[in-house]
């Protein structure tokens, strides 16, 4: 499960950094709350010239686990952190 987020251009660099760090902290706390998460990493793009601001990488045993995670209230709450600043999102789910 790989997700990229782009924040709105009109959001200041300072506000982006605050929101990105809050999101990272919230997502990285999820494995303690959602047992189906095998691994999660959130990378913050420090290169302002690039399109995507946040990269989220996570591992699950099954696609059903991904679906469970996607609708879990703690995950939904973490996603709300980006609600006002997110411009776009790209997601890829694949099996190994």
Predicted ranges, named:
Residues 1-7, 41-70:
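Short, well-ordered beta-strand segments in beta-rich or mixed alpha/beta enzyme
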């Amino acid at each position: 499960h790989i997700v990229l987020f782009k924040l709105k251009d009109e959001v200041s660099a300072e506000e982006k950094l605050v929101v990105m760090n809050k999101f990272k902290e919230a997502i990285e706390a999820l494995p303690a709350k959602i047992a189906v998460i095998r691994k999660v990493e959130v990378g913050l793009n420090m290169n302002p010239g690039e399109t995507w601001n946040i990269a989220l990488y996570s591992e699950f045993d099954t696609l059903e686990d991904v679906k469970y995670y996607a609708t879990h209230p703690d995950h939904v709450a973490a996603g709300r952190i980006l609600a006002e600043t997110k411009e776009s999102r790209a997601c890829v789910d694949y099996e190994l």
